[in-house]
Amino acid sequence: CNATAALHIAAMALGVKEGDNVICTPMTFASSANCIRFCGGNVRFVDIDPETYLLDINKLKEILSTAPKGTYKGMVLVDFAGYPHNMEEYRKVADEYGMWILEDACHAPGAYFIDSTGERVYCGCGKYSDITVFSFHPVKHITTGEGGMACTQNKEYYEKMALYRTHGITHEAEKLQREDGLWYYEMQELGYNYRITDIQAALGTSQLKRARKNVEIRRELVRKYNEAFVSISEIKTPYEAADVYHAYHLYVIQVEDRLGLYNFLR
């Protein structure tokens, strides 16, 4: 099991089907778009904001405004490097065009933005996005060796994902088509074996108590990097707005001669 599996069942729960058009950022790992292709959907890439590396909301509005409403079913938004979207603004756009939001927060556990009410909106809380996915890959903030998680506040999406992750099988009495003893279960959908083991789950939960501290350590390292690079005009360090708390899975810099720097560091 992994975040790719979580993205897949999230797309299934959202109802992505053959021919559906979905918007995605090109600045991500393949799974963010492939989860739509797994379901037969079509992916339309929309360019990023060069400061945040997130899907550019102005370009998004431009594309949506030139297409008939209903052309696009949803959007996959990736909190790249740990920088959270202002989901409140994207939610307004999604609602205007009748779209759902699948948030790929694999880089961003613990990240948040401040919304118009002054509330800290953490990635995964579900206030504005329909489903959020996290990764427990070895290099992520929390690891289970390999694994992923999908979060939602929507009961319908939750029940669908719970079914899809376990072969489409249920033991829940109220959902069974007949009563035939406590041993009885039914396969009601074509599902998958998308479950991490109990040992992996225990490994992951054991890290929760230090999850916030781990983000703080990353942010302190970023502060030191920024101080070290402040006098080097050739290096552009990561941007962070005042209303954002960046989780810094990655420390992304921009330079004029990327290949030259790469070869030098080798």
Stretches with model-predicted labels:
Residues 1-21, 35-39, 45-47, 116:
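Phosphate-binding glycine-rich loop
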Residues 48, 138, 166:
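Short, conserved catalytic or interaction motifs in soluble domains
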Residues 20, 26-28, 47-49, 105, ...:
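Nucleotide-sugar donor-binding loop of glycosyltransferases
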Residues 18-21, 71, 159-160:
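Short acidic capping loops at alpha-helix termini that bridge into adjacent secondary structure
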Residues 12, 34, 38, 62, ...:
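Short, well-ordered alpha-helices that flank and scaffold nucleotide-derived cofactor binding pockets
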Residues 51-144, 149-157:
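Active-site phosphate-binding strand-loop segment of PLP-dependent enzymes
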